[in-house]
Amino acid sequence: MGKWSGLGLGLLLLVLAGCGAPPLERDEWKVIPTGLSDKADLLDIAFVDDKNGWAVGSRSTLLRTADGGESWTAVPVKLDSDSRFLSVSFDGKNGWIGGEPKRLLRTVNGGASWTSITLDQRLPGSPLKVYALGADTAEVVLNSGLVIKTVNGGKNWQVVTPASAGGIRSAERVADGSYWVVSTRGGSYLQWKPGDPQWTNYERTSSRRIQAMGFSSGKAGWMINQGGEMQFTANQGETWTPGRSVILNGLSLLDADYTAADKKIWAAGGGGTLIVSADDGQNWKAEEVPGIKGSLLNVEFIGNKGFVLGQNGVLLKYRGAAD
């Protein structure tokens, strides 16, 4: 089915999900053409500066923008095999791309050229998330639950975490250098802080398995569980609210992110679902994006910009400042 089956269902959803949030303008997002085939999914996005940015995805997809995300151009990359690029990160002109199978690319010139970095085959797993942390420094989270780090541009790597977190499905690095990850089956989530002798494991508090989790630049955080359920924290994960279903259309949520200053949180998922809360998840409103039927996979607010990435090359851009 489409995102919502008409205005009546949309209004019903708003009533059921709770009222009281500020009215949602129907044009808060716009569709940006990417020219991608129906088989390519967009999975992550990052910017070099205010104008220049990169988006990555399946089928070795690499897109570049030079106008702040208003238009995108595909950039061919020569690889020995097709790759699924899962993550991209920049610190100035220094950037990294990570993905499957065991794929890692590096640039030192804002993406004008990319170099393939070979990882030791003895390292278990493939890059799930990459974090550019300086001219030659980066950290990479492997889907086996290990975090590795380089300080010389990828020539050498050291294992940062004392042990593996086990297979993981999502990972988030916060400002103090600690990591939060979700186990592959979603039965638990784990935290590691620099200096900790091991990962700290937390069992889920909901009967529903965890899909993903993330944090704002402050102490606010979100957790998505199966079936469109969400939980929230205001103290960087020390405590979480009880699970609460925020969508009632039978579709799952897959990702979320806070706007600047944590004033709103947007969540996205299956069937083009895109919802927003301005009161810490108590009430939600739905954004209708005509023609979007596939899953929306990633929500990213970067400075004053916002983007949603999805299946079949879908790319949405937030209208106006992400306040």
Swiss-Prot record:
Keywords per UniProt: Cell inner membrane, Cell membrane, Lipoprotein, Membrane, Palmitate, Photosynthesis, Photosystem II, Signal
Stored Gene3D superfamilies: YVTN repeat-like/Quinoprotein amine dehydrogenase
N-palmitoyl cysteine lipid sites: 19
UniProt-listed Pfam families: PSII_BNR
Any one Gene Ontology cellular component term annotated for this protein: plasma membrane
Cellular compartments annotated: Cell inner membrane
UniProt main location, coarse: membrane
S-diacylglycerol cysteine lipid modification positions: 19
Record's function text: A factor required for optimal assembly of photosystem II (PSII), acting in the early stages of PSII assembly. Also plays a role in replacement of photodamaged D1 (psbA). Assists YidC in synthesis of chlorophyll-binding proteins.
NCBIfam families associated with the record: PRK13684.1
PANTHER family given in the database record: PHOTOSYSTEM II STABILITY/ASSEMBLY FACTOR HCF136, CHLOROPLASTIC (PTHR47199), PHOTOSYSTEM II STABILITY_ASSEMBLY FACTOR HCF136, CHLOROPLASTIC (PTHR47199:SF2)
Protein name per Swiss-Prot or TrEMBL: Photosystem II assembly lipoprotein Ycf48
